[in-house]
Amino acid sequence: MNEEKNETRWDRLLAVRTTGRDDTNADQYRYPYEPTPYSVLERLANSGLIRKENTLLDYGCGKGRVDFFMSYQTRCQSIGVEYNERIYEKAMNNKESAVASGRVLFALANAERYTVPETVDRIYFFNPFSLELLKKVIARILNSYYENRRTVKLFFYYPSDEYIAYLMTVEELSFSDEIDCRDLFDGNNVREKIVIFEIAV
């Protein structure tokens, strides 16, 4: 099935509207909203790394695609954090109609100031912000970990070289695995992957 049809099919099935890029309020620190392709999310869901007992935190959630899809497919709890009020309202509108809305929460907040709930043990990023903000967010995640030690997996889709270089220097993080997604798209782009890091107890 081609990507465009797959996008429409899943939005219809989940009873949400998440397609389309949005550059509103994007700047050098916070990047435009662009949803993760459903084909990539299917691969993540099929990995078995996110399950019913997990709580997923999605930074820069936009209209909530990751949250609705993963909650529907894996039955996990999901929290989406979005700083853009206009896009956050679209996520909340989707929540009213979405199939899996009962397991999804949204927070209107700046990621670098958001307190990570102690139940969160899976965290998703699709290049939502600059390296400068990522460092502050990782510090928040580590604070949450030290308050309640548990295994936390961090998923980075389409990561930049600077993201990976930085993550490799964080003592508490260890590289765990990667999910190759190059075959889903034309061009054999080496960034088409989900890189997984872990904070282990």
Model regions and ranges:
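Conserved class I S-adenosyl-L-methionine
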Residues: 53-62
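Conserved SAM-binding strand-loop segment of SAM-dependent methyltransferases
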Residues: 101-109
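A short SAM/SAH-binding and catalytic strip from SAM-dependent methyltransferases
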Residues: 122-133
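C-terminal substrate-binding/active-site "lid" region of AdoMet-derived donor-dependent transferases
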Residues: 132-192
